């Protein structure tokens, strides 16, 4: 990733800032998923696949930075500790560098076409998330599909395109499912951690929209808590009791059922791939071994 920045950014101060952002990354799961899909679909040039993965990781990093700036959270991140205008400019620089790197591979014009498609979808999903467009759970799931699923589809479909030269709709489909799995799992654990951005901005998360249906007294009480910030933060001091409230309101069961539904959708789609059983199992292991507590869209 640093090599790509070095090749495209001549401003030394900006380069050093971008290097520090890259160094702060703890995982490179999108690049890993790109390379995995490239290999299982028959690709053999790992050098090219690695360069594609690095370009995609740069795009994801730019997306993470812009997401944090827009949501005004993740305050421990380096880009949230400096002037916001400087961070925004750095994010746009990374975005441009990432696209330039992918375009320069010049292997298949379809790769760049689909990268732009998924980036465009993710931005529109992010817009709907910021503006609280979702009024129903189905609308929220569609926003999640666009905002999160599109980025995972970007990594996986690009890897397949590099290997085969052809777009694979099945890969796109299960990538969207994976995005939904990652986000709804993250939303649940963020609720337990007291993410101030979601609460302060009264975000129309899937859980919030579920609670608004007021299935029982417990869901009404929980919605009241979330709508009154001081009471919500105070209730989080006793995590065990708060978790009991989530169970009584049906939130825990609701999220568990949704996770299982989309997990099975993901598995079913993977089984439709024209690949050996061992390769299908490898994809399942990669996609479905997400970590509890993940709050971002991860592969």
Curated annotation (Swiss-Prot):
Protein name: Tryptophan prenyltransferase ComQ
Residues that, per the record, bind Mg(2+) 2: 67, 71
Taxonomic placement: Bacteria, Bacillati, Bacillota, Bacilli, Bacillales
Effect noted on mutating residue 63 to F: Reduces the farnesylation activity using FPP as the prenyl donor, but geranylation activity using GPP is comparable to that of the wild-type enzyme
Alphabetical keyword list: Cell membrane, Competence, Magnesium, Membrane, Metal-binding, Prenyltransferase, Transferase
Protein family membership: Belongs to the FPP/GGPP synthase family.
Catalyzed reactions: L-tryptophyl-[protein] + (2E,6E)-farnesyl diphosphate = (2S,3R)-3-farnesyl-2,3-dihydro-2,N(alpha)-cyclo-L-tryptophyl-[protein] + diphosphate
Originating species: Bacillus subtilis (strain 168)
GO biological process: establishment of competence for transformation; isoprenoid biosynthetic process
Inducing factors: Expression is maximal early in growth and declines as the cells approach the stationary phase.
Top-rank taxon: Bacteria
């Amino acid at each position: 990733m640093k090599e790509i920045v070095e090749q495209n950014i001549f401003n030394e101060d900006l380069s050093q800032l971008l290097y520090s952002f890259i160094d702060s990354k703890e995982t490179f799961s999108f690049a890993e998923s790109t390379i995995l899909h490239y290999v299982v679909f028959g690709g053999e040039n790992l050098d090219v696949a690695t360069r594609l993965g690095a370009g995609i990781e740069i795009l994801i990093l730019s997306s993470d930075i812009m997401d944090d700036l827009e949501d005004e959270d993740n305050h421990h991140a380096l880009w949230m500790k400096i002037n916001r205008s400087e961070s925004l400019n750095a994010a746009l620089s990374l975005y441009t560098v990432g696209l330039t790197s992918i375009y320069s591979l010049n292997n298949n014009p379809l790769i760049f076409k689909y990268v732009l498609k998924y980036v465009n979808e993710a931005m529109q999903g992010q817009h709907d998330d910021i503006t609280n467009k979702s009024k129903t759970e189905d609308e929220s799931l569609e926003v999640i599909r666009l905002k999160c699923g599109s980025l995972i589809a970007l990594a996986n479909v690009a890897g397949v395109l590099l290997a085969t030269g052809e777009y694979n709709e099945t890969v796109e489909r299960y990538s969207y499912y994976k995005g939904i799995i990652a986000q709804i799992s993250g939303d649940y654990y963020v609720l337990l951690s007291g993410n101030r951005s979601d609460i302060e901005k009264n975000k129309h998360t899937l859980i919030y929209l579920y609670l608004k249906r007021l299935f029982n007294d417990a869901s009404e009480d929980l919605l009241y808590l979330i709508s009154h910030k001081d009471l919500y933060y105070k209730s989080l001091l006793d995590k065990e009791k708060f978790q009991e409230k989530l169970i009584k309101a049906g939130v825990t069961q609701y999220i568990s059922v949704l996770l299982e539904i989309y997990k099975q959708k993901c598995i079913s789609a993977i089984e439709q791939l024209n690949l050996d059983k061992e390769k299908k199992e490898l994809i399942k292991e990669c996609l479905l071994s997400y970590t509890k507590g993940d709050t971002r869209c991860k592969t």
